[in-house]
Amino acid sequence: MCIRDSSCTLADIAPHIFPLAALDGTAARVETYLREKGVELRFNAGAAAIGKRPDGGYTAAFTDGSALDADLIVLCVGTRTNLPFLIPGQINVNRGIVVDDHMRASVPGVYAAGDCCEGNNLQSGQTQVIGLWERAGTQGRTAGANLAGENAVCDGGMVQNITHFFDMDFISVGDKRLSGESVSFTGQGGRLYIEAVVEAGQIRCVNLLGGHRISGVIRSRLWKTARGSARGLSPEEIGLLRREDVPEGFITLLGGSGL
């Protein structure tokens, strides 16, 4: 809408942009970027009511007491499990159906996969709904194989987020809720921004702005770390990171040294 010179406002009940994925420094940069593009941002302002005006437009009222007139309103809601058909207490349910690594629910013979279930978060060790297509596919194959009498295992997943807007890519890998020290790096003349949470020398979560070419290396590294199989970066991986002007300090944190 902003590209077409229309006034655009993004309102969110959350305190900042991408609340489940963006670290503080990354969120601040994204918000500055959006405002520079002409997007008005309102946070801590969830939609309370939407009314139609006599002229055909609409008025949105927000939970912070403010209101906004608009010609077009788009209401966006994230993933939510749809489980009203289950009798309360019949099966173990949190935000989703809780399953083990065979995708078995708490009732024998019942399996669940995809957005309706809570699988293992490899980093936290807790069950969590991880609404990703790749995870849903793996969970579905595991559940199907076990229903057919096999012994398949899905050890878990990792929280990830990839969003493209205007000419910017935002990528998050890892669980931002995990404790640690926040560190940041810039490269490519400021076009690349990296923010990471580090605990005991291990990266727990990474935010990238403008770094889609290096996201695969980072994702692979965090997956291996979560599974306890991480080793040093390969020469090819280090070469890719250096070609993309990734700071040496971050390469070292990832496990690249001596080359």
Please identify what each model-predicted range represents:
Residues A11, K52, A61, V99, ...:
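Hydrophobic alpha-helical segments, especially N-terminal targeting/anchoring helices
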Residues S7, E40-L41, T59, N92, ...:
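Conserved beta-strand segments of alpha/beta enzyme cores
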Residues G51-A67:
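Conserved beta-strand-loop-beta-strand element in the redox core of flavoprotein oxidoreductases
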Residues C116-I214:
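Mid-to-C-terminal Rossmann-like scaffold of FAD/NAD(P)H-dependent oxidoreductases
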Residues G187-S257:
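C-terminal auxiliary extensions adjacent to catalytic cores
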Residues A67-T142:
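FAD-site-proximal beta/loop scaffold in flavoenzymes
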Residues R4-A49, C154-I162:
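Rossmann-like dinucleotide-binding cores of NAD(P)H-dependent redox enzymes
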Residues T9-A11, R42, V74, Y111-A113, ...:
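Hydrophobic/aromatic beta-strand patches that form the interior of the parallel beta-sheet core
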